[in-house]
């Protein structure tokens, strides 16, 4: 009798201990939201419950919201026909920051990579089939290592221009693809939109463009052209020559609304169209997301001497209204720029303007200019020394997304 009571007592005690040690599932979710993306990818296979939960919209949106509060810097560089991805946190002080290698993807030229959109990127992948080289958009997530190739770009032409965007209404990633005319001017033709919808096969549709234009490359590298575009609140903006509107030497801005599949153009104002030359080379000007608005960064060059930065901010797209801000930089600017070719990277959420060298060296760094304080801060980047002399591209505000490619079922 005593033995039975003892066994029963031990059994009840064990059950009570199990109850006290069991963690509420809501608390488990809170813990998971703070784990790296790759850990989330592994935990999807723990059970069907975890799989459905971690793939659910509530969890993925919550994870992205947390990631938005701590965005990272993304670096890409080409080596041995592979594009390698590194990331690092934003600097908190003057201390060097380490760039951690994620992985590589078969993107033939990193200059063809669109800027990250909610953690995803779009680059161009080349493959040879039956003796013919085919160029296809490749969508990838550097955080999870997942990628997918859009093999149904309907064209026989090699020159495909692709831009990645996100439709905030339908909450789908979309890719705008267009080809270049082979005869005469390189006008955009065969406009297509690919929709990447969760749980479904990617869909494609041809769309009409009533604006005769051609996107303007901002750089040429090893036979490839780099086209610069930025997606803000579901609208893609890129530089282009609009026939009948633009001067053939100086581009306007064309915008594409992913929600309505409509093209529009935005006229530039006097000062946008300056031919920018310095030390015998052309300086870059780029479109950026400046505090939620479209903006354009370009060097300020009175008398062909670089003295600062000019920031154009789009205040009203319908009225084609821009505001201009000129920042005269402190003396260290000229010394740094003359020694190393710097490129505009973008702007931080605080409004700082960021530049960097376009080639990795033993002292690769980011230059932060604070317009309010008129100060320059240089932060060294470590971890990419084995890629010295290779070209690098830097992206700000990279987010980590836990959505995985397989749910798109190619």
Curated annotation (Swiss-Prot):
Residues 17-66 form the F-box domain. It holds the Pfam family FBA_3. SUPFAM superfamilies: F-box domain. SMART domains: FBOX (SM00256). Disulfide bonds: none annotated. Coiled coil: none annotated. This is F-box protein At3g61340. It comes from Arabidopsis thaliana (Mouse-ear cress). The lineage of its organism: Eukaryota, Viridiplantae, Streptophyta, Embryophyta, Tracheophyta.
């Amino acid at each position: 009798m005593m033995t039975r009571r003892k066994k029963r007592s031990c059994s009840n005690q064990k059950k009570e201990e199990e109850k006290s040690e069991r963690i509420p599932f809501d608390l488990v979710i809170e813990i998971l939201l703070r784990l790296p993306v790759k850990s989330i990818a592994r935990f999807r296979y723990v059970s069907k419950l975890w799989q459905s939960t971690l793939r659910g919209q509530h969890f993925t949106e919550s994870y992205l919201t947390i990631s938005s509060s701590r965005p990272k810097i993304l670096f890409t560089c080409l080596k041995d026909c592979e594009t390698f991805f590194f990331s690092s946190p934003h600097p908190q002080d003057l201390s060097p920051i380490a760039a951690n290698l994620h992985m590589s993807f078969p993107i033939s030229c990193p200059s063809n990579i669109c800027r990250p959109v909610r953690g995803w990127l779009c680059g161009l992948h080349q493959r040879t089939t039956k003796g013919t080289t085919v160029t296809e958009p490749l969508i990838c997530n550097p955080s999870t290592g997942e990628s997918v190739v859009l093999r149904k770009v309907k064209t026989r032409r090699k020159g495909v221009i692709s831009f990645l965007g996100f439709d905030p209404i339908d909450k789908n990633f979309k890719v705008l693809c267009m080809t270049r005319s082979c005869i005469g001017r390189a006008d955009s033709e065969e406009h297509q939109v690919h929709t990447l919808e969760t749980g479904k096969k990617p869909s494609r549709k041809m769309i009409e463009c009533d604006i005769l234009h051609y996107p303007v490359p901002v750089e040429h590298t090893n036979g490839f052209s780099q086209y610069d575009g930025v997606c803000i609140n579901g609208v893609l903006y890129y530089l282009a020559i609009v026939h009948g509107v633009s001067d053939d030497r100086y581009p306007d801005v064309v915008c594409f609304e992913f929600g309505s599949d409509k093209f529009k153009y935005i006229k530039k104002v006097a000062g946008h169209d300056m031919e920018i030359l310095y030390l015998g080379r052309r300086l870059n000007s780029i479109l950026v997301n400046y505090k939620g608005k479209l903006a354009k960064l370009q060097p300020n060059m009175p008398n062909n001497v670089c003295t600062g930065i000019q920031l154009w901010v789009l205040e009203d797209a319908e009225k084609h209204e821009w505001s201009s801000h000129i920042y005269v930089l402190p003396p260290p600017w000229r010394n740094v720029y003359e020694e190393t070719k710097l490129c505009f990277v973008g702007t931080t959420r605080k409004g700082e303007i960021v530049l960097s060298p376009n080639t990795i060296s033993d002292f690769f760094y980011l230059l932060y200019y604070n317009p309010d304080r008129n100060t320059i801060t240089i932060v060294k980047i470590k971890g990419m020394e084995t890629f010295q002399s290779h070209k690098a591209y830097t992206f700000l505000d990279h987010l980590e997304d836990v959505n995985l490619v397989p749910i798109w079922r190619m």
